[in-house]
Amino acid sequence: MPVFRSNALSSVLRAEHMAAGRPAVPLAEDEAYWGEIQRAFDADRTLINLNNGGVSPTPTHVLEAMIRDLRFSNEAPVEHMWSVLEPRIESVRRELAKEFGCDLEEMAITRNASESNETMIFGLDLKRGDEVIVTTQNYPRMLTSWDQRARREGIVVKQIKFTVPPPSDDYIVNQFREAITPRTRVIEITHITNLTGQILPVAKVVAMAREKGIEVFVDGAHAFAHFPFTRDELGCDYYGTSLHKWLLAPIGTGFLYVRRSKQKSLWPLMAAPASMDENVRKYEEIGTHPAANHNAISAALTFHRAIGGERKVARLRYLRDRWAKRLLAESSRVRVLTPLDGKQAGGIALFNVHGIDSAKLQGWLWAKHRIITTPIIHAEFSGIRITPNVYTTLDEVDRFGDTVLEAIARGVNV
């Protein structure tokens, strides 16, 4: 076995000593503390990666834990992987359930949010004519999945719209409420949209829908480990997320939460025996897969807890405000489509520049300056999504701001 010499854990220990119980918001600006966190990553610093929403680098000690298990598996897969490593998924289940605030028998380990959400989408029995409410800002893959079910089974999928940014939580709840009819069976809501980073009022929508006997599926792909919350704060019965985004777990990890009382009526995506009808592990019946990826979730969770959820989101908001408020202050042509006040957003934000095509600006940022961003071209709005993470340096954020101001002053055709 190779000997790994990751400095990630020692960096976290030094950072924790620096924090010493200090409040999260002032600590967000302590570059010595965050410098220790940044040293836990083996990130490519020849570029500036501001698209951590799709997938994020994992700390080196998490990666090394996964590699260690992959090597061990490869020595004798049928014994090492299936008999030794796979049973350790139960420890991962227990710790994830504790973090989310649910029973461990309600926590299924999946490969990503899409797998979790499609289990919900295809798993509930619906009849021709039954209605599902989504929004035009739901994740495209989920909209495609609902559309396939509509084409195949004759259910009706209704898409509602809300302004960007929305004026209030109550406005969003009312948009859902007004779309409900006697045929409505399901609402799918994103916890935080991948387009603008808007955090939606999940708890209020769940409460409203429950009074009417409507199931609510929550797509939490960008929420878990991005900002603190628990299952009971949402009140939801179903929740799907990826863990390779904000938890910084290995690529190809996620979870699906299904309340115990709902498990019997939600079919798994792949077949499971009738004896597993009320066993959350039926959602993990996916055939042969590496144990290394999901076992390393535990190391990522330990890293997340060492930072702390409040500290993390305070830092992410600080980085967001650093570039967004600067651009707003220095150019009247900049518009930020994400709320910057209160707790309606975390580290994700969307902006555009009047007179500059967002797709061209995104391409220019990469081609000329090696800055990775995400173009958002939606039927109702467009812009560039900026998504830093805890390994992002202040210098990288400032260089991004400098570059956008250069584009505003000189254009993107030079």
Q: Model-derived features: where do they sit?
A:
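Pyridoxal 5′-phosphate
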Residues: 2-414
